[in-house]
Amino acid sequence: MTKFENVTVVKKANIYDGGKVTSRTVEFADGTRKTLGIMMPGEYTFNTAEAEIMEMMSGELDIRLPNEDWKTLNTPESFNVPANSSFDLKIRTVTDYCCSYIK
């Protein structure tokens, strides 16, 4: 899906790590939500409450998911993150992403 229709976009940005990671929340009529964002080069750890599907639209990164070794992803790629976990990222180039939250 390259665009979303009939959605609500939350005006206030989600800002992490001093502005190096930012996103906007997109809410759908069925109650689901996604975030669209940009990650600048750097190393980050994120914690999840809900399961997530992370789609990388552009960029290059290394990821370490729970109980896994580091692996390199070149876009376009996606990965799943379990609920109530954390994952580590090493962003190599500016990375454009879409995060879908799974209930």
UniProtKB/Swiss-Prot annotation:
<comment type="function">
    <text>Catalyzes the phosphorolysis of diverse nucleosides, yielding D-ribose 1-phosphate and the respective free bases. Can use uridine, adenosine, guanosine, cytidine, thymidine, inosine and xanthosine as substrates. Also catalyzes the reverse reactions.</text>
</comment>
<protein>
    <recommendedName>
        <fullName>Pyrimidine/purine nucleoside phosphorylase</fullName>
        <ecNumber>2.4.2.1</ecNumber>
        <ecNumber>2.4.2.2</ecNumber>
    </recommendedName>
</protein>
<keyword id="KW-0808">Transferase</keyword>
<comment type="similarity">
    <text>Belongs to the nucleoside phosphorylase PpnP family.</text>
</comment>
<dbReference type="GO" id="GO:0047975">
    <property type="term" value="F:guanosine phosphorylase activity"/>
</dbReference>
<keyword id="KW-0328">Glycosyltransferase</keyword>
<dbReference type="InterPro" id="IPR011051">
    <property type="entry name" value="RmlC_Cupin_sf"/>
</dbReference>
<dbReference type="InterPro" id="IPR009664">
    <property type="entry name" value="Ppnp"/>
</dbReference>
<dbReference type="GO" id="GO:0009032">
    <property type="term" value="F:thymidine phosphorylase activity"/>
</dbReference>
<dbReference type="GO" id="GO:0005829">
    <property type="term" value="C:cytosol"/>
</dbReference>
<dbReference type="GO" id="GO:0004731">
    <property type="term" value="F:purine-nucleoside phosphorylase activity"/>
</dbReference>
<dbReference type="GO" id="GO:0004850">
    <property type="term" value="F:uridine phosphorylase activity"/>
</dbReference>
<dbReference type="InterPro" id="IPR014710">
    <property type="entry name" value="RmlC-like_jellyroll"/>
</dbReference>
<dbReference type="Pfam" id="PF06865">
    <property type="entry name" value="Ppnp"/>
</dbReference>
